[in-house]
UniProtKB/Swiss-Prot annotation:
Coiled-coil ranges per UniProt: none
Modified residues (N-acetylalanine): 2
PANTHER family: A1 CISTRON SPLICING FACTOR AAR2-RELATED, PROTEIN AAR2 HOMOLOG
Gene Ontology, cellular component aspect: spliceosomal complex
Name of the protein in its database record: Protein AAR2 homolog
Pfam assignment, any one: AAR2
Subunit structure: Interacts with PRPF8 (via RNase H homology domain). Component of a U5 snRNP complex that contains PRPF8.
Record key words, sorted: Acetylation, mRNA processing, mRNA splicing, Spliceosome
Family membership: Belongs to the AAR2 family.
Gene that produces this protein: AAR2
């Protein structure tokens, strides 16, 4: 880790007040990072010092010893660090990952007593990016992390998956009406169908809130189904009451958690969840009236998140549609309603102007949502 210029008095205060994470035996050349910073580990690396208290995301990628250019997938984990706290971890050489099991208390206390001597092997936390990190995580609490992180606590860019059925023998494939492995494949679709169904290894998947696929209540009339398909407030309220009964604002912590897992953890599934959750929030006009403070904070969150991603990132490479502009177009249209809180309405107007100036996104064209909506009715629901 490269040396950083820091005011001596500030450095002294941070040394005594900040938290320390010690990671023993991490191999030289490993890509290691904390929050918005990453480095290539040198031979003397033992961890990071002067870390401000709070939630942090540590991430790393192992490197092939025989071929240092071969870098493994990103892995990471969240830590909630206390003032003057000390966390002692070690590298598991067999699994090529950081062992997150707690170190014996005696070892921690011995390490604490030896911190002055260990100081030369600890890199200082880069305070130049602290404000950016806080802006991306200010709604992520310890409870958010405990609720969402995998049971293993390790967040992996590529999930470890296992086949739902082993199908080790030909008779197993026959039982599932699948052809023999040696049979010629006649089409791409047939090839896909032959692939085994996979599932994440137990304890390794991020435990995101389940989002509804049906946006209307059971027994809804055709008119109600259409209304709830245009304004997703019913579906959003279902999520808020079920997943965040104590504080609806906590949904923003999950939105930030998903974004960090994607941006710094390279977890594509987290990006997909972020999109689905954002879509639900932005297309809920009635909820904007009821939860105006939640939406004021949502705008602030999006302001910081969108500053970290290229403007064309959200454009579908096939359809050329931009998920974000179409979603925010509906949001800005709803925010103009006279029923919406004035503070929220004004903040939405300023945010729209900011995005138009920065990304040259057009939000004035008529939203596709204004076109007639074709809704699939459940079985048993008549139109007469």
């Amino acid at each position: 880790m490269a040396a950083m210029q820091m005011d001596p008095e500030l450095a002294r205060r941070l040394f005594f007040e900040g938290a320390t994470v010690v990671i023993l035996n991490m191999p030289k050349g490993t890509e290691f990072g904390i929050d918005y910073n990453s480095w290539e580990v040198g031979p003397k690396f033992r961890g990071v010092k002067m870390i401000p208290p709070g939630i942090h995301f540590l991430h790393y990628s192992s490197v092939d010893k025989a071929n240092p250019r071969e870098v493994g997938p990103r892995m990471g984990f969240f830590l909630n660090l206390q003032q003057r706290g000390l966390k002692v971890l070690r590298w598991d050489a067999a699994r090529e990952e950081v062992d997150l099991s707690p170190a014996p208390e005696a070892e921690v206390e011995a390490m604490r007593a030896n911190l002055q001597e260990l100081d030369q092997f600890l890199g200082p936390y880069p305070y130049t990016t602290l404000k950016k990190w806080i802006s991306l995580t200010n709604f992520i609490s310890e409870a958010t992390v405990e609720k969402l992180q995998p049971e293993s606590r390790q967040i992996c860019a590529f999930s470890e998956v296992l086949p739902v059925l082993s199908m080790r023998h030909t008779k197993d494939r026959v039982g599932q009406n699948l052809p023999r492995c040696g049979a010629e494949c006649k089409s791409y679709q047939e090839g896909l169908a032959r692939l085994p169904e996979m599932k994440p290894r137990a304890g390794t998947e991020i435990r995101f809130s389940e989002l509804p696929t049906q946006m209307f209540p059971a027994g809804a009339t055709p008119a109600e189904i259409t209304r709830h398909s245009m304004d997703l407030s019913y579906a959003l309220e279902t999520v808020l009451s079920k997943q965040f009964p104590c504080s609806p604002q906590d949904v923003l912590g999950e939105l930030q958690f998903a974004f960090v897992c994607f941006l710094l953890g390279n977890v594509y599934e987290a990006f997909e969840h972020w999109k689905r959750l954002l879509n639900l929030l932005c297309r809920s006009e009635e909820a904007m009236v009821k939860h105006h403070s939640l939406y004021v904070n949502l705008i602030s969150i999006l302001y910081h998140q969108l500053g970290e991603i290229p403007a064309d990132f959200f454009v579908d490479i096939v359809s050329q549609d931009n998920f974000l502009t179409s979603t925010l177009q509906v949001f800005f249209s709803s925010a103009r309603s006279v029923a919406v809180d004035a503070t929220l309405r004004q903040k939405a107007e300023r945010f729209q102007a900011h995005l138009t100036k920065k990304f040259r996104w057009d939000f004035e064209a008529e939203p596709e949502d204004c076109a007639p909506v074709v809704v699939e009715l459940p079985d048993g629901v008549g139109t007469g």
